Amino acid sequence: MRGCYTALITPMNRDGSLDFEGLHDLLEYQSENEVAGIVAMGTTGESPTLDWKEHMSVVSKTNIFCGADLHVIAGTGANNTKESEEGTREAIDLGVKTILLVDPYYNGPSSLEIRREYYEPLAREFPGANFIPYIIPGRTGTMLLPEDLALLSEHCPNIIGVKEATGDFSNMRAIRRLCRENFPILSGDDEKTLAMMADPTILASGTISVVANILPWTMREMVNAQLDNDPETAKQLAAGLMPLMGIVTVKTEEDTPRGRVMCKARNPLATKTLMNILGMPAGPCRQPLGKMTMGGMVKVIEAARQVYATRPDFFEPIEEFFDVDVGERLHDKTNWEGLCYDSY
């Protein structure tokens, strides 16, 4: 597991139905930009708000559209091992060979339980499939600890890596220290990817990226430069990308009739908002996700403008593939209509 994998959004029509034509276009765009692979139905793909039939239709079409060109990884994690088993079986039957399993959320199992009652049963039930645990305690409220990940990878050789999204570098270092030699660590946080790869006590081998939905070529080049021992190029690309990496989640303070509050627009809301502005297939998010505030959307636009002003070449693949003028779209307010709430 090396390189840049895109945590793909799920494009939707205005009525909230799945946009498979848009999905095909996005996958073709990713393929042309030579990413290492695609994660279908992760957090960015809005897996919590798609029913299993929709979930599997996205996995199926992604696998068909990608063919042999891209490594497809299907998210089938749940907080119910039986449900995850059924989803995993269906994904494997559709031809997917690699599965992303998020730690069980909400019901709060211990790390021991996560290992013994979730990851190990699933990995053993499907010995011909590869599994990647996805550790993101900010979403799940629990986490597989490095010690249990090390035991898991020893007991189950089809655990082929980890998506690490704790934001905790000491946790990442513990994974590297405890797990088998060359065990792949993939960044789950765009802002931290280069630091994770460059740190000799972590040595991440790539990323599962949100920003790659928009700028797959540049994210790929950054990751590959670091893998190819060209840290200066990697740093230059990361510096150019940083404003967009900073808007995967957008925080704003908002005035309400009852006082001032903090508003946090979480992934994929900001990413889909920007993709809509740029003229890429994205559409709305599924409820209970909704829209950004005006202040949040302005932050997104300003970040994109900043990147465009310093590195317009980053956006050339979008302009060529989707036949759009990025500079015009980032300054024409008609492209933003309806993408944010009118008031709090």
Where are the language model's segments positioned?
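Active-site beta->alpha loop and helix N-cap motifs at the rims of alpha/beta catalytic domains
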Residues: M1-M143, G290, F314-Y344
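Catalytic alpha/beta core domains of metabolic enzymes, predominantly
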Residues: P121-A129, I136-E253, C263
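A generic alpha-helix structural signal
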Residues: L27, V59, T88, R176, ...
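Short alpha-helical interface patches
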Residues: D51-S57, L151, M297-R305
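Structured C-terminal cap/extension of enzyme domains
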Residues: M197-Y344
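A general structural signal for well-ordered alpha-helical segments in protein cores
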Residues: L23, V59, S84, Y119, ...
